Amino acid sequence: AAIAEDYPYDAVDTCAADGMCATACPVRINTGDLMKRLRAERHGERAQAAGEAVAEHWGGVSGTARVALRAAATLPRLAAAASAVARRVLPEDLVPLYSREVPAGGDTRPAAVYPANPAVVFFPTCLHQVFAPAETQQTGEHADRGARPSDTAGRGSGYAFLALCEAAGIAVAVPEGIGGMCCGTPWESKGFTDGARSMARRVVDGLWNSTRQGRLPVVVDASSCTHGLAGLGHLLPDDERVPRLRIEDAVAFTAREILPALTVPAKAASLTLHPTCSTTHLGIGEELRTVAEAVADEVVVPTGWGCCGYAGDRGMLHPELTDGATREEAADVAAYPTETYASCNRTCEMGMSRATGQVYRHVLELLAERCAPQDAGAHRTR
């Protein structure tokens, strides 16, 4: 009886559902998939319909979240008190806990663009629209100022990636309707399968057109979103277009296609690197380290590295999850300070910043701030 009573919290509510258990299991059993299924079974028809409605109006919803976080950042004590009261009245699994380390709302996503001969289609994620990058979080400045893509300071990893492509002479397209697109992970992880499927259809329609029926690769600037987009097939098993879409993380693309065209005149002395669960699933740990080594002379991955437990917004719903998940890694970080700290996913950066007291930033932001093209003219035809 005690196990049954505690199971909803101990298992369903506080599972990060990141699938890292499968990497340790000799037969690849992923209990995160089970937890997502159990979450879905909790939702009735009305809840599923609400989740689908959010997906269908995602552009407005994500924009509202961005504005709300900006407002909260101006009155953090009031926002924290309001969220604490709401969590006493409503289930904690519905109301995130607001605290000072939660970033303000971020920048708008890069606008749709389609040059004459694009080499790649860029999928800028909504993570960096909803949550400001760490630099903006520190300065309190916001970047809706019509800046060129190369003006990356405070604009997040999406604009950093565009700047790196510009420096390397790589033409980039951004899909029409990107403001209403998402990888679908927020719905899947919470068990809103109807919303996840609705979003998957919209994304596949948009990417199919912008990639010229799968001929161009799709590059994504947040590792969890890359992983989510790469796994859309199970939501649309009968859609023959899905396997033809080539999804790649921006870190891997940068390591292979951009770094050879750049020099980094001023490296950091040392960098602590937090790989993510998604980089493990995607198999791009070496590429992440390669980019980090372009930023700093010494790259340190803590021996106690593991899932940060932030898991999208789950670290805000259940802060104790992140506290427990990061304890060993945070101790390693404290024992060996470095000049800078990096990862490749905004919410993981938030989780590690909270756990360690250090400012974690996307490794592409750090690279874009330090790099210069080797010979920009020599690469303009790519």
Residue map of PLM features:
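Ferredoxin-type iron-sulfur electron-transfer modules and their immediate structural context
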Residues: A1-C15, P26, G32-A47
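Iron-sulfur cluster-binding electron-transfer modules in prokaryotic oxidoreductases
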Residues: G32-R382
